[in-house]
């Protein structure tokens, strides 16, 4: 690195000062070549870095030399600078060659990492030859491996096929050797299927039977749940009908009772009035007639007719009215006794009147009509 940096510095100085002599330029070129040509012990892995730095550092001064070869501000090209271009050409060739060798060396160094090989340019070609031989050997080995691997592929595919075919053949042989067992195995499967079908068929009727049983149970439950309500409703209806009948009967009985009561109340009054009318007439001696009992009989039916207008409706009404009439007659007798102070007996009076009429007929021989006389 020391000579390369000094050469670069000198080249830079020469570009700055165009008045440098040709001898100095030649010396700088020789020094740069000697720097590149000197063998240095270095590792193969480090060659890329060192040579890369050399290339990077060597290229800028060449460009600067090119710039120095361009026309100056005065427009005159110095004659001393022309041989520099010629001298620079072999330098470029050397740098290009070194760059090409350096480009090949880093790849080889990456392929094989080994101990550092000290030596110059003479050692490098031998190492390169060895590396090439080793690379060719590895490539040949890899090709052989590929060539061996390629036939293995179909063979490997064929082996599973052969194994499958062998298995199938073994199975076929077993089947042929034991056809009875195969036949027995098949019916077993069929019998199992039949059994399962039979079991399923039995389960289905059981399910249907269960449904049939459930339906009557539901019906009975519904009937049991509904029957009390229905019975209660029917009983309630019957009781309501009975109540209605009772109400109607009560209504029918009420008018009958009302009819009885006014009739009972009216008949005694009529009887009382008839009796009152009859009694004064009977008391008068001039108005007494032998037909008195007949009149009484005629009057009494008139009073009874008012009470017996509806004998079909109620038969008991007649007896009840007769009892009341008797009671009223007794009351009238008591009233008459209270007024006159004497006890009046209608029966005795009627007998006396009849006897008096008979005596008159015997005397005169004629019937005396009291009514006509009056």
Curated annotation (Swiss-Prot):
Bias-annotated ranges (Polar residues): 16-26
Signal peptide stretch: none
Keywords: Phosphoprotein
Disulfide bridges in this chain: none
Region (Disordered): 1-168, 241-299, 328-374
UniProt feature, compositional bias: Basic and acidic residues: 44-59, 120-134, 328-359
Record PTM Phosphoserine, positions in chain: 169
Recorded superkingdom: Eukaryota
Record's keyword annotation contains Phosphoprotein: yes
PANTHER family in UniProt: GLUTAMATE-RICH PROTEIN 5
Protein name: Glutamate-rich protein 5
Gene: ERICH5
């Amino acid at each position: 690195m020391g000579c390369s940096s000094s050469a670069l510095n000198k080249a830079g100085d020469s570009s700055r000062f165009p008045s440098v002599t040709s001898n100095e330029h030649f010396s700088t070129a020789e020094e740069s070549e000697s720097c590149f040509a000197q063998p240095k012990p270095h590792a193969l892995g480090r060659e890329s870095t060192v040579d890369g730095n050399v290339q990077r550092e060597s290229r800028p001064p060449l460009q600067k030399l090119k710039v120095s070869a361009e026309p100056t501000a005065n427009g005159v090209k110095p004659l001393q600078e022309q041989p520099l271009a010629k001298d620079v050409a072999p330098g470029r060739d050397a740098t290009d060659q070194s760059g090409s060798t350096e480009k090949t060396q880093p790849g080889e160094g990456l392929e094989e990492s080994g101990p550092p090989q000290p030596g110059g340019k003479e050692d490098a070609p031998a190492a390169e030859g060895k590396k090439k031989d080793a690379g060719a050997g590895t490539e040949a080995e890899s090709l052989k491996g590929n060539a061996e691997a390629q036939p293995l592929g179909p063979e490997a595919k064929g082996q599973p096929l052969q194994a499958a075919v062998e298995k199938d053949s073994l199975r076929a042989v077993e089947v042929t050797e034991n056809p009875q067992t195969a036949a027995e195995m098949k019916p077993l499967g069929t019998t199992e299927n039949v059994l399962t079908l039979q079991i399923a068929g039995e389960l289905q009727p059981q399910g249907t039977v269960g449904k049939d049983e459930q339906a009557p149970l539901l019906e009975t439950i519904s009937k049991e749940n509904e029957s009390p309500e229905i019975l209660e409703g029917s009983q309630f209806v019957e009781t309501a009908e009975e109540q209605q009948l009772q109400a109607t009967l009560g209504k029918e009985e009420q008018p009958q009772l009302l009819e009885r009561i006014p009739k009972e109340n009216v008949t005694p009054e009529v009887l009382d009035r008839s009796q009152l009318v009859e009694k004064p007439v009977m008391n008068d001696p001039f108005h007494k007639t032998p037909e008195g009992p007949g009149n009484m009989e005629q009057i009494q039916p008139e009073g009874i007719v008012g009470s017996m207008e509806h004998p079909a409706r109620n038969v008991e009404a007649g007896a009840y009215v007769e009892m009341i009439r008797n009671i009223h007659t007794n009351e009238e007798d008591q009233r008459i006794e209270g007024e006159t102070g004497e006890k009046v007996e209608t029966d005795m009076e009627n007998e006396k009147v009849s006897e008096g009429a008979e005596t008159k007929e015997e005397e005169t021989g004629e019937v005396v009509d009291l009514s006509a006389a009056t």
